[in-house]
Amino acid sequence: MLHTLHRSPWLTDFAALLRLLSEGDELLLLQDGVTAGVDGNCYLESLRNAPIKVYALNEDLIARGLTGRISNDIIPIDYTDFVRLTVKHSSQMAW
């Protein structure tokens, strides 16, 4: 399943998101959700321990001035990669 986090993790039921993640799922951080991938925040360690790959939309990182502050564990992607993820996963959950 593809999970997309478009809101700040501080304004989302992040614990519920983590509970619903399964091995093989993927999470895309976009819009204000990219803040979850910033080094040093309380949500990043939870994402590191999850059995998933985590991506961040590069355009949203740039728009928020976060390109140099994002963790190396987060994979920056462009819109073409975003489309590939949506095609790859038949089910999606937006947060």
UniProtKB/Swiss-Prot annotation:
Task: Indicate whether Iron-sulfur appears among the record's keywords.
Answer: no
**So which domain of life are we looking at?**
Bacteria
* Protein name per Swiss-Prot or TrEMBL: Protein TusB
The record's Gene Ontology cellular component field reads: sulfurtransferase complex
| A Pfam family | DsrH
Which family, according to UniProt?
Belongs to the DsrH/TusB family.
Q: Where in the cell is it found?
A: Cytoplasm
In terms of InterPro entries, this protein maps to: DsrEFH-like, Sulphur_relay_TusB, Sulphur_relay_TusB/DsrH
- Per the UniProt entry, what is one GO biological process? tRNA wobble position uridine thiolation
UniProt keyword list: Cytoplasm, tRNA processing
**What is the protein's known function?**
Part of a sulfur-relay system required for 2-thiolation of 5-methylaminomethyl-2-thiouridine (mnm(5)s(2)U) at tRNA wobble positions.
| Chief location of this protein within or outside the cell | cytoplasm
Task: Read off the PANTHER family from this record.
Answer: PROTEIN TUSB
Q: Which organism is it from?
A: Escherichia coli (strain SMS-3-5 / SECEC)
What does the annotation say about its assembly with partners? Answer: Heterohexamer, formed by a dimer of trimers. The hexameric TusBCD complex contains 2 copies each of TusB, TusC and TusD. The TusBCD complex interacts with TusE.
